[in-house]
Amino acid sequence: MATQEYLYEAPPGLYLSEGEVGMNKRIHIYYSGSVQGVGFRFTAESAAQTLGVTGWVKNLEDGRVEVVCEGEEAALNKFLDKIKDIFGGYIRDARIDPEKATGEFGGFDIKF
């Protein structure tokens, strides 16, 4: 699957088709900009836990923040919206790639 750039928009294919209602999706996100040292990871963790989204978030050495998360489409879209609403002024770009959900996560964690 080719990687594409998306600024605050869910990529095509993230949205559920008619036969997939209730099935979990997975997205892999790289946020760039001034996204470290502003409470991004802790806010992402709180938003994910509130919405029932599972996965993890971590700072990368190159200054980006990486997020892998799974959940129902509506919850993932609310998660993306929450991050955009709070950190939109800090985010220069967001690369969002849909992936196949694995169900491997029991919660949402901050990786250090």
PLM regions: where:
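Intrinsically disordered, low-complexity, mixed-charge
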Residues: A2-F112
